[in-house]
């Protein structure tokens, strides 16, 4: 197998590592049965608090970044870098370790973007964060961040491979948040800081 194929597989496996599930398990909690059932940092925050949530967020961000670093070490093309970034996100969303279920891919998307294009990532982050702080809806901030990253990639004149990668990541974010969109419309979406009982 070529280096490109191996790197794509490694990126998927990196992304598949379910940090939220593993961290919650150390507290005797099955994260998939708590709150939203999501394996990401937001649900960890609801169930276990800020400390464990920050650990999960850090891991989910940097597993995407590690995938990009490995791809660069192999000297892969720009388009392959984009493919590796997407595979890491798909691994998080559809983890082989969780029977192809997983999270929403926001932190991992940010991590890949941070290592692909730090300037774009650091322009995008405060936009998404501002929406979260203003509304206390993490889902709204996540989707806004996805749109902002795509718009900024166009505005900043980024190359086609990067624009395409960011566009597909934004689409994935909206796809994984489709139930959140429904709850936002219905007014039943949980806000940041709302706790749930950890079982």
From Swiss-Prot:
Probably interacts with PlsX. Belongs to the PlsY family. GO terms for cellular component: plasma membrane. Keywords: Cell inner membrane, Cell membrane, Lipid biosynthesis, Lipid metabolism, Membrane, Phospholipid biosynthesis, Phospholipid metabolism, Transferase, Transmembrane, Transmembrane helix. SMART domains: G3P_acyltransf (SM01207). This is Glycerol-3-phosphate acyltransferase. It comes from the Bacteria. Its EC number is 2.3.1.275. The gene is plsY. The chain crosses the membrane at residues 3-23, 50-70, 78-98, 113-133, 154-174. The keyword Lipid biosynthesis applies. It comes from Thermus thermophilus (strain ATCC 27634 / DSM 579 / HB8).
């Amino acid at each position: 197998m070529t280096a490109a194929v191996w790197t794509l597989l490694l990126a998927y496996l990196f992304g598949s590592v379910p940090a939220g599930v593993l961290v919650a398990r150390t507290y005797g909690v099955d994260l998939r049965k708590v709150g939203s059932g999501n394996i990401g940092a937001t649900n960890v925050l609801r169930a276990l608090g800020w400390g464990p949530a920050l650990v999960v967020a850090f891991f989910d961000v940097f597993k995407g970044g590690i995938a990009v670093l490995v791809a660069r070490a192999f000297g892969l093309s720009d388009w392959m870098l984009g493919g590796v970034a997407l595979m890491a996100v798909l691994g998080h969303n559809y983890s082989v370790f969780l029977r192809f279920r997983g999270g929403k891919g926001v932190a991992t998307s940010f991590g890949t973007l941070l290592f692909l294009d730090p300037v774009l990532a650091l322009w995008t982050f405060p936009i998404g964060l501002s929406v979260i702080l203003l509304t206390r809806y993490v889902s709204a901030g996540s989707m806004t961040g996805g749109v902002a990253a795509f718009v900024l990639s166009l505005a900043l004149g980024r190359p086609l491979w990067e624009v395409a990668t960011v566009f597909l990541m934004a689409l994935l974010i909206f796809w994984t948040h489709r139930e959140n969109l429904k709850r936002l419309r219905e007014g039943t979406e949980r806000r940041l800081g709302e706790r749930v009982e950890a079982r």
